Amino acid sequence: AAAASAVGVDNTTVIGTTTTTSALVHGLKQPVIAASANVAAAAAFPNSIFNFSDADGASVTLPDSGDGSQIGKSYEFITTVTATSNAHQISLTDDSNEKFIGNLMRIDTDSSDAISADPALIGDGFVEILMNGSTQGGIKGSYIKCTNIAVDLWFVEGTILCSGTVASAFN
């Protein structure tokens, strides 16, 4: 019988088999990476939480997904310090082929917490999310998750906190 848990020669830990229907993994946690300065694609580790923690803003560039090696990998972003200059930004490496699809819920924090949708459709061709700390979101408490679901295609979900006349965070 195949081993239920093993470490392969490529340093991949395998838990269960293709017929496993349930697995408990105790003590599993995600790394939290400070995004207090720009983070290049090579330093954007998958299944991590990036903490936008600098009022000067920062940019995290997601790795190129064109070769299929990113499929199934997710990147999460939480704003703990509102950007007051520049912006908190999430960008795709290949802005010619890669695209964001999905939806960000916007909560307008200065007008009875009105909620609106900020959809990203495939035809929109969005390649970055720009949170300016006010109208485009990125106020402390904003959350975004980006998951590569296919070659050159990233699914976005989250809730961003905005103020003023809210505008799309997608570019």
Model-derived segments and spans:
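Residues that act as N-cap/strand-start positions at coil-to-secondary-structure junctions
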Residues: 9, 54-56, 140
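A general structural signal for short secondary-structure junctions and capping/turn motifs
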Residues: 4-6, 16, 67, 134-137, ...
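Extracellular disulfide-bonded cysteine-rich modules/repeats
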Residues: 11-14, 140-148
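Structured beta-strand segments within beta-sheet-rich domains
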Residues: 116-142
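A residue-level signal for beta-strand positions that form part of recognition/binding surfaces
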Residues: 12, 22, 49, 143, ...
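Exposed extracellular interaction/assembly regions and N-terminal maturation sites
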Residues: 26-119, 147-171
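Glycine-centered small-residue hotspots that permit tight backbone geometry or close packing
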Residues: 1-4, 47-49, 141
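Small/polar residue-rich beta-strand/coil "junction" motifs that cap repeat-based extracellular fibers
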Residues: 1-30
